[in-house]
Amino acid sequence: MENFSLLSISGTRISSSALSTLPDIMSSRATSLPDIAKPVLPTEVPSPVQALPPQCPGGVLRHGVHNIVISPDCILGDAPNGEQLRWNCTIYRPWFSPYSYFLCKDKESHLETYSFSEVQRDEGQRDSCLPEDTADSVCSSSPSPENTCPREATKKSRPGPDTTDSITFQDILMASKWHPAQQNGYKCASCCRLYPTLHSLKSHIKRGFKEGFSCKVYYHKLKTLWYKEQKARPGDRLSLGSGQAFR
């Protein structure tokens, strides 16, 4: 190694005899040192993409979910007993992920995988959860009686006070009984704003949250208290004295 210490940019000039010995030293060092110029490649592992079965017809794309429906099934080689292995293959890509996932299951196995029917069912449930105003307009615009609104069916099957889910004109008038009578409009019992018609007051209650008002929550709470009081005293109706406690 002392021979290499003579190699310096600012040092003295090396004689030609010393330089002639350097190739021999380098060659001997090169034979003894490990071969680092050639990186050792890891054993090639077949990636999932390379191990994919042959493409089968029937690809479906819907909202980022690739579903390959095999007709009848993808055939992946032969089994040791001579029977052909059949697999149900699905490519699944979540909407929040840039990667796709390849799912395969044997036809005879009972392992559950992500199927396209579940995606359609989830999307159907997501589409059925429309806003209240949109659902009301869709239900009111359906001409045939067969097209029943799923929201109304949910309300009817929901246990408890189904009438407290929506605010009606009767509820608005009942809440206004404990306020001074207005000569030229209807007053909101929550924010005390005055509206010319009863329909405009109801629209304010339903859509007031877009403007920062919580009147809809107030009327819902008020109606829930009315229901609890009617349930506690089923023979009595709400009177003026009992309603003044909600002011």
From Swiss-Prot:
This is Spermatogenesis-associated protein 46. Residues 137-147 have a biased composition (Polar residues). It comes from Bos taurus. Pfam families: Spt46. Keywords: Differentiation, Membrane, Nucleus, Spermatogenesis. The keyword Iron-sulfur does not apply. The keyword Nucleus applies. It is found in: Nucleus membrane. GO terms for biological process: cell differentiation; fertilization; fusion of sperm to egg plasma membrane involved in single fertilization; spermatogenesis. Residues 125-164 are annotated as: Disordered. Its main location: nucleus. Plays a role in spermiogenesis and fertilization. GO terms for cellular component: nuclear membrane. The lineage of its organism: Eukaryota, Metazoa, Chordata, Craniata, Vertebrata. InterPro entries: Spt46-like.
